[in-house]
Every structure is written in C-alpha cells, then in structure tokens.
Amino acid sequence: MPVKKYKPTSPGRRNMSVSTFEEITKKEPERSLLEPLRKKAGRNNYGRITVRHRGGGHKRHYRRIDFKRDKIGVPAKVAAIEYDPNRSARIALLHYVDGEKRYILAPLGLNVGDTVMSGPDADIRVGNALPLRQIPLGTQVHNVELEKGRGGVMVRSAGAAAQLMAKEGNYATLRMPSGEVRRVFIECMATIGQVGNLDHQNIRLGKAGRKRWLGRRPEVRGAAMNPRDHPHGGGEGRAPRGMPTPKTKWGKPARGVKTRHNPRTDPFIIRRRTR
C-alpha cells in the first residue's frame, strides 16, 4: 500500500499523506454483514466520560468480522479486499462453497481469487487458520486466540505479526509485535501470515480536522489548565510544573509506572514487552 503525498498548497496539505487504496477492489460493503454502530463519545452507561478526547467523527457501519474462523474444513474464495473504517487493517470478503459470506482480516499477500480454509488439516498458507499445535515453528501468525473458541484477540492491527517460537506441553510460545514473549494454549487458533496495510504507520494526518473526522477531540495540556483541574495547572504565565516528576490529571505518576494489573495471567508472560 503506497502512501501518496500532496504538494504544499496549504498548511494542512503540506505535511499530509494518504493511502492510495490501490489494494481495494470493492467500494460498497456487503450489506448482509453490516451492523449499526452507535456513537459513545467516550461515555459509559451512566453518561460519564470514561475515555477522554473522544466524540464526533464520520458516521460508520460496523463490519461483522469472523475472528473465530470456526467454519472448519470448508474452503472459501476471496471475493474482494475492502476498506474498513473501524480498524487499521483491510478486510477480505470470503465466499464459502456452501454460499455463506464472511469478512476476515486481510493478511499481506492475500489476493482476490485465492482460496482459504480453517481447521487442523488446512495447508500452511497465508490466510488459513489452524490450531497453534499444527503450525510450524518460526511461522508468522496473526489474529491469535487467548481462549479456545473465543476468537482472535491479539495481533490484529495493520502490519502486525507474532512469531511462533516454541511448543512445550499444552502451551505454545509466541513473540508478540511489542517484543513481549508469552505462552498461549496450544489448541488456540491463529491465522497464517502478517496483517496487511503495512504503510498505515507512515500516514501523516496533516491537520487537526482530519483527526476530528476519526472521532478524536483535542487533548489539552495540563499546564494550560487551572490548578483545580490538573496538578500542572495554575501559575502566572508559563510556570514550571512545581514537582519532580509529571503527574496525570488525577495526581498519579505519569511516566515510568506499570499500568498492567492482571496477576491472574502473569505466569503466562515469559518476557515483558520492550516497547
């Protein structure tokens, strides 16, 4: 997916880049796989903001993606590669031989006309989904399950891939895109290959308005707030923060603090992430 740059005809265009979308083969989505998507604007069921800087954005439909890949042993043909506004990856429309249609994440190298299949007897080929037990060591995988039958929850964004490093007993060892090395139950499903749309990380939005189209509202610096609103706030003019380390809006350390609190799954992590 090459990235297109513009001539600097305006301040917003000067640093803007967009995808060429040349891998997209179908503009209109499959209507039978669409669902309404209601905007939350970062609010929970009480109406309180739980995620800041969210709201607005272009109206979207949700594309129902098959993360489980549970249609075992039934081949499907790739009918189209489509754009999905709800994720960084592209999606592939599959037509199964029994007439069913499903969307999956489009891996790098999957083209219209290719045949994919899921199950323990599937070939080791891009787009096929197999249990980790059946996948050779060193293979790149994505859309990895953490619990058998629950569907893939890891390694799903554009350009992501995990590497299968070892298999021992009931667990397989994976090196994640973050550098974390963790164990996963060996019967969990994973899809062969790397998620496509690799150049997503090279796109520059160029202007604040384009961020608003994505549903992101402005982030205000703590130093620009009043002292009642942020520990860094207040002072006459530009004032130092007045503390040795930066704090969050709620007074907690903002740098170098572990944010993971799930001791139940700690034994499955062999090495912490490096970035």
Curated annotation (Swiss-Prot):
Residue spans of biased composition, Basic and acidic residues class: 227-239
UniProt xrefs under PROSITE patterns: RIBOSOMAL_L2
Gene Ontology molecular function: rRNA binding; structural constituent of ribosome; transferase activity
Gene Ontology CC terms, in alphabetical order: large ribosomal subunit
Signal peptide (UniProt feature, chain positions): none
InterPro entries: NA-bd_OB-fold, Rib_uL2_dom2, Ribosomal_uL2, Ribosomal_uL2_bac/org-type, Ribosomal_uL2_C, Ribosomal_uL2_CS, Ribosomal_uL2_dom3, Ribosomal_uL2_RNA-bd_dom
Record has RNA-binding as a keyword: yes
A single GO BP: cytoplasmic translation
Keywords of the record: Ribonucleoprotein, Ribosomal protein, RNA-binding, rRNA-binding
Stretches the record annotates as Disordered: 220-275
Keyword Phosphoprotein attributed: no
Subunit structure and binding partners: Part of the 50S ribosomal subunit. Forms a bridge to the 30S subunit in the 70S ribosome.
Family: Belongs to the universal ribosomal protein uL2 family.
Physiological role: One of the primary rRNA binding proteins. Required for association of the 30S and 50S subunits to form the 70S ribosome, for tRNA binding and peptide bond formation. It has been suggested to have peptidyltransferase activity; this is somewhat controversial. Makes several contacts with the 16S rRNA in the 70S ribosome.
Name of this chain's protein: Large ribosomal subunit protein uL2
The organism of origin for this protein: Roseiflexus sp. (strain RS-1)
